[in-house]
């Protein structure tokens, strides 16, 4: 996994996970995300670890009008980290 996204949101964790999986990961990013894993921090916070083959395209998808509207509707705030293997 080379990317970590920490998200806070107003919908439930299950709604967040379902929407992000079906609308974003399996639709918009299906060609650049090879695997992913959700970690529930609490009902309104998630850590998403994923392997992304093109971080530039990921950024473009996250800034798309559809993604921006979804974020606004669900009060979603993302912090994105690139992860590098240390040892």
Please place each PLM-identified region on the residue numbering.
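Short S/T/G/P-rich N-terminal loop/turn motif that feeds into the first structured element of a domain
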Residues: 1-68, 78-87
